Amino acid sequence: MALLKISVVVPEGEVYTGEVKSVVLPGVEGEFGVLYGHSNMITLLQAGVVEIETENQKEHIAINWGYAEVTKERVDILADGAVFIKKESDDRDDAISRAKKLLEDASSDRLAVSSVLAKIESL
């Protein structure tokens, strides 16, 4: 299976870069998945969790909003704010707290924020 290149960038710099099997993005019309060979598109992203599947594990990045450019071979995410939540990390609890704060500040839609926060807490 061909791998997809992905980068997640915020104004302060790069949050994540790598080669992945798939990525699920929080689009404004709902979540959608991207695999290698996807049609080209540019889309607006809402507050949510970017789910990244690598060869060995799943990784998660909380974003407050942004844009994604998808091509056949890569996904470039430009976000206003992002927190990488590493599964095997000493600062995991701190990352989850920062992700919750980022998402709570991103939207006044309490129902949508609650749904995303529940997803983060289950990681």
UniProtKB/Swiss-Prot annotation:
It is found in: Cell inner membrane. It holds the Pfam family ATP-synt_DE_N. Keywords: ATP synthesis, Cell inner membrane, Cell membrane, CF(1), Hydrogen ion transport, Ion transport, Membrane, Transport. GO terms for molecular function: ATP binding; proton-transporting ATP synthase activity, rotational mechanism. The keyword Membrane applies. GO terms for cellular component: plasma membrane; proton-transporting ATP synthase complex. It comes from the Bacteria. It is a peripheral membrane protein. The keyword Transmembrane does not apply. InterPro entries: ATP_synth_F1_dsu/esu, ATP_synth_F1_dsu/esu_N, ATPsynth_dsu/esu_N. F-type ATPases have 2 components, CF(1) - the catalytic core - and CF(0) - the membrane proton channel. CF(1) has five subunits: alpha(3), beta(3), gamma(1), delta(1), epsilon(1). CF(0) has three main subunits: a, b and c. Produces ATP from ADP in the presence of a proton gradient across the membrane. Belongs to the ATPase epsilon chain family. NCBIfam families: ATP_synt_epsi. This is ATP synthase epsilon chain. It comes from Helicobacter pylori (strain HPAG1). The gene is atpC.
